[in-house]
């Protein structure tokens, strides 16, 4: 397991060896020797795991390795931090800088030679302890080979493997949909041990077409062991999907739970609703929720999932408690073979016999079976016996526990994949994780190495897909064939947390205890009080500080906590900064965090960035989403490493060349016109936001050609009220020479369509998602899509909420849009006449 850390440090040493400063100081050779020794030790660690050595001697040796790996990282990072700090100083400090540089150079030479002596001592101890030999692999980088294999793999399957729950689904659907007045079951509780499939069953019911049609509105929330009633209520309100984003921001400011209860009660009163409350551990959680849910016997239902029978049967007098059973062997085998044999062309009797022996020992627990099958699906057939033998050595009570299967799966991961999985321990229990954010964090942490053929973000996505394929992570939401959000089962999360603690990988803040001095990351899930962040012991070796959770009123962050100089990741989403009594300004001290790669200030009300932001030349991601628009000039031109800029920059936004830029959401048309579009070759996600409230004097004529110059552009959103779209290039937005070879999603908001734009748009070769929101059809009465048009389009959404010229008719020819699965026409367009093929009528939604 420690190999995850040593592998990471080896990659970091490799990056520093490229720096010519080390060669000038005469320390490069020493660092090369250090790397060679650590590479050998990295291999010995794999040997310790392979031989399943768990004796005290091996544990002590691996602890020594972990300590020195972290010390190597600290020495290198601290030295280069000082170099960067000195490079920012000018004028009278020049002489002091020269003296300081000489002192720093002397110190790092001594530090590296001390580390070299320590690592040689560790090597001698290995021989004394009798830890086995290691043959370093030759040839092409294993990680690169595996990443390319993943790239060629089929896309993630959206269909969840649900076996043995068919009867449960039928029984509970009857309960949910029944009109029988004698059936007073307002609450349905599903209970059973962890890993049986309670959430999977509830999700199956929640997504049922019959259920969607029966209820006016639905909501899903989770509770978990550490819960706050406030967070649960906010999640229910958001999940209902009937409250605007602006209203949600106001709701988050409610100070008392009672205010939220009254608000939710008002939303649901008179409606036929369904609410799923997942993973309840404490009966008080339901008691605090039920006051907010009207029980007027209009057919509304609440589904509760829990491991505890007393909660399932005792929540209410009208409860129907449904106990989940273990799978039969036949069901277990069906679940297993669907995944385990998916990559095997021919399954012989010996392989079946070996598989059945292992499945029997899983005792009918679905989670253990899917993790085991995920492990074996990646093994060659001759390796199955090795897995079986290893399982037999680890049997507990003559059965395979989920922890046993997980240990085997984790053990054989490459170190990069181990780090990615351990990062799931950062997130709260039952938390829905946005994959885009997770990818940005993994890259910023330095866990991802660039492949010859792929960008780091694509490599990170491959790792997440592999964890999904191994059944260690659940794909929650999928769009355009990509996992957009995911979740980890709480049992697997517990195992990830256990391993993360052993490695000092992360500490989840607890006001009763402090993390160790070498812990690399600290994460806060709940604020105990608003000012707790102001008065805390600072761990100067920390690389990441994250607040992840629901915003609870106002959480203040004192600027003294922003002086952790080695930070690579700072995520303060949902908190407020205290900076000279101005809460919408990021403190100047942020410019001292020159190692920073990720700055998350979403939902913080920050709308002004200080000039010191220019010091963050290694910054890769700036996430200011959910904040008020940045009205003043924002200068990011010196941030040459920027890959992702997220926020509403309505004033002038200076980007520089932007050669590394992949995400730009969102800037004004004026700022876009100032960029050199030819240099934006890596840009994949672009949003232009022009609104009369902010940019009357800054609006400039645009042409679709400017958007087509970044050839890798996949997502384009234009929110430009009252702008016109036609085939003429002299208009504000023209469709002349449209050429988007990679575009997958196009959203137009507030655009005036002067003519039928579909003939031009339907030629986009990879377009899967087209949204026309609040568009004005002033020059169009009939919009038509011809045969063969939109060959890959899966979703077409047309809506109009404000007053304007609507559309009389939408015509779709017989062979058009062969891939379509969703056609939405809503708002003032509900009266639009649809002339469409019969095959598409099942996909139409008018709401």
From Swiss-Prot:
UniProt keywords, alphabetically: ATP-binding, Coiled coil, Nucleotide-binding, Plant defense, Repeat
Annotated coiled-coil segments of the chain: 24-41
Binding site for ATP: 192-199
All copies of domain NB-ARC, residue ranges: 143-453
GO biological process terms held by the UniProt record: defense response; response to other organism
A Pfam family reported for this protein in Swiss-Prot or TrEMBL: Rx_N
CDD domains, sorted: RX-CC_like
SUPFAM superfamilies noted in UniProt: P-loop containing nucleoside triphosphate hydrolases, RNI-like
GO molecular function, one term: ADP binding
Domain of life: Eukaryota
Domain notes for this protein: The LRR repeats probably act as specificity determinant of pathogen recognition.
Assigned protein family: Belongs to the disease resistance NB-LRR family. RPP13 subfamily.
Functional summary from the UniProt entry: Potential disease resistance protein.
Descriptive protein name: Putative disease resistance RPP13-like protein 3
Source organism: Arabidopsis thaliana
């Amino acid at each position: 397991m420690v190999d995850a850390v040593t592998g990471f440090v080896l990659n970091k040493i490799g990056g520093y060896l490229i720096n010519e400063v080390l060669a000038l100081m005469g320390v490069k050779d020493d660092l090369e020797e250090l790397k060679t020794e650590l590479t050998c030790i990295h291999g010995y660690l794999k040997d310790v795991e392979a031989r399943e050595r768990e004796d005290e001697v091996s544990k002590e040796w691996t602890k020594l390795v972990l300590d020195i790996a972290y010390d190597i990282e600290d020495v290198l990072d601290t030295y280069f931090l000082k170099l960067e700090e000195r490079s920012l100083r000018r004028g009278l400090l020049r002489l002091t800088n020269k003296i300081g540089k000489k002192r720093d150079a002397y110190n790092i030479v001594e530090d590296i030679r001390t580390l070299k002596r320590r690592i040689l001592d560790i090597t001698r101890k290995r021989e004394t302890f009798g830890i086995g030999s290691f043959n370093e692999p030759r040839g092409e980088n294993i990680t690169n080979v595996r990443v390319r294999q993943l790239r060629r793999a089929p896309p993630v399957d959206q269909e969840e493997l649900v076996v043995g729950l068919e009867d449960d689904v039928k029984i509970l659907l009857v309960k949910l949909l029944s009109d029988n007045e004698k059936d007073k079951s307002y609450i349905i509780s599903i209970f059973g041990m962890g890993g049986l499939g309670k959430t999977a069953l509830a999700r199956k019911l929640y997504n049922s077409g019959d259920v969607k049609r029966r209820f006016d509105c639905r909501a899903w929330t989770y509770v978990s062991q550490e819960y706050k009633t406030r967070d649960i209520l906010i999640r229910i309100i958001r999940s209902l999907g009937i409250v605007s984003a602006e209203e949600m921001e106001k709701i988050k400011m409610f100070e008392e739970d009672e205010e939220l209860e009254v608000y939710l009660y008002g939303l649901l009163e008179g409606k036929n609703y369904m609410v799923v409350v997942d993973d309840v551990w404490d009966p008080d959680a339901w008691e605090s929720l039920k006051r907010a849910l009207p029980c007027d016997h209009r057919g509304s239902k609440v589904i509760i999932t829990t491991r505890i029978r007393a909660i399932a049967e005792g929540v209410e007098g009208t409860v129907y408690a449904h106990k989940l059973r273990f799978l039969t062997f036949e069901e277990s085998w069906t679940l297993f073979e669907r995944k385990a044999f998916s990559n095997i062309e021919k399954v012989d009797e010996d392989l079946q016999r070996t598989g059945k022996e292992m499945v029997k020992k899983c005792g009918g627990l679905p989670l253990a079976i899917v993790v085991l099958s995920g492990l074996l699906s990646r093994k060659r057939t001759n390796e199955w016996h090795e897995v079986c033998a290893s399982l037999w050595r680890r049997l507990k009570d003559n059965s395979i526990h989920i922890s046993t299967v997980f240990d085997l799966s984790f053990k054989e991961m490459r170190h990069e994949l181990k780090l990615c999985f351990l990062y799931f321990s950062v997130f709260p229990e039952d938390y829905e994780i946005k994959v885009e954010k997770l990818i940005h964090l993994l890259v910023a942490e330095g866990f991802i190495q660039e492949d010859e053929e792929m960008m780091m973000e694509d490599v990170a996505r491959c790792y997440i897909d592999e964890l999904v394929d191994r059944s260690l992570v659940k794909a929650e939401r999928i769009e355009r064939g990509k996992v957009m959000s995911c979740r980890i089962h709480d049992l697997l999360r517990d195992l990830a947390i256990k391993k993360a603690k052993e490695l000092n990988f992360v500490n989840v803040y607890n006001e009763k205890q402090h993390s160790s001095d070498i812990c690399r990351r600290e994460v806060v899930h709940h604020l105990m009080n608003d000012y707790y962040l102001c008065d805390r012991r600072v761990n100067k070796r920390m690389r990441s500080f994250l607040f992840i959770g629901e915003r609870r009123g106002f959480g203040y962050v004192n600027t003294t906590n922003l002086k952790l100089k080695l930070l690579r990741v700072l995520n303060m989403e949902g908190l407020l900064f205290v900076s000279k009594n101005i809460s919408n300004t990021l403190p100047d001290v942020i410019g001292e965090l020159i190692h920073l790669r990720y700055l998350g200030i979403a939902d913080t009300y920050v709308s002004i960035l200080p000039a010191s932001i220019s010091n963050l030349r290694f910054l890769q991601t700036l996430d200011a989403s959910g904040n008020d628009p940045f009205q003043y000039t924002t200068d990011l031109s010196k941030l040459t490493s920027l890959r992702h800029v997220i926020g509403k920059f309505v004033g002038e936004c200076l980007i520089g060349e932007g050669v590394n830029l992949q995400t730009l959401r969102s800037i004004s048309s004026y700022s876009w016109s100032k960029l050199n579009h030819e240099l934006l070759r890596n840009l994949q996600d672009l949003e232009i936001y022009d609104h009369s409230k902010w940019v009357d004097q800054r609006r400039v004529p645009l042409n679709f050609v400017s958007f087509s110059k970044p050839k890798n552009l996949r997502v384009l959103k234009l929110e430009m009220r009252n702008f016109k779209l036609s085939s003429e290039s002299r208009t504000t937005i023209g469709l002349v020479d449209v050429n988007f070879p990679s575009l997958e999603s196009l959203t137009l908001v507030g655009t005036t369509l002067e003519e039928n734009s579909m003939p031009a748009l339907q030629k986009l070769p990879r377009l899967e998602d087209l949204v026309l929101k609040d568009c004005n059809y002033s020059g169009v009465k009939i919009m038509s899509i011809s045969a063969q048009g939109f060959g890959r389009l899966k979703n077409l959404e047309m809506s109009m909420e404000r007053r304007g010229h609507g559309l009389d008719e939408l015509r779709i020819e017989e062979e058009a849009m062969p891939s379509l699965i969703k056609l939405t026409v809503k708002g003032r367009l509900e009266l639009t006449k649809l002339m469409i093929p019969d095959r598409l009528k099942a996909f139409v939604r008018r709401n």
